[in-house]
Swiss-Prot record:
Signal peptide: none annotated. Keywords: Cell cycle, Cell division. NCBIfam families: minE, PRK00296.1. Prevents the cell division inhibition by proteins MinC and MinD at internal division sites while permitting inhibition at polar sites. This ensures cell division at the proper site by restricting the formation of a division septum at the midpoint of the long axis of the cell. The gene is minE. This is Cell division topological specificity factor. Coiled coil: none annotated. The lineage of its organism: Bacteria, Pseudomonadati, Pseudomonadota, Gammaproteobacteria, Moraxellales.
Length: 95
């Protein structure tokens, strides 16, 4: 019987086909959110910290061992576009 891989399974290597891949566990999850509106007014330091905690809760539902220091969020402007970049360092996958 063939199994369809779910999004989270393929991303975090939770199915049998990815179980042997040590590199999968050390890769970063990168998410870039871009908005034509200015983010400065909406994203204060407090809101970014709250966002980090909420993201950490969701990630830890699928990958154990991610700490708040493993979540990095950066805001920068490029021309008329604001970019919010998030990097999450995942712990090593143990066999």
């Amino acid at each position: 019987m063939s199994k369809k891989k779910g999004f989270w399974s393929s991303l975090f290597g939770t199915d049998d086909s990815n179980a042997g891949s040590a590199n999968m566990a050390t890769e970063r999850l990168k998410v870039i959110v871009a908005s034509e509106n200015r983010l400065n007014n909406r994203l204060t330091a407090d809101r970014i910290e709250k966002m980090k905690r909420e993201i950490l809760e969701v990630v830890n539902k699928y990958v154990n061992g991610v700490q708040i220091d493993d979540v990095n969020i950066n805001h920068r402007s490029e021309d008329s576009l604001d970019v919010l970049e998030m990097n999450i360092n995942l712990p090593e996958h143990k066999k």
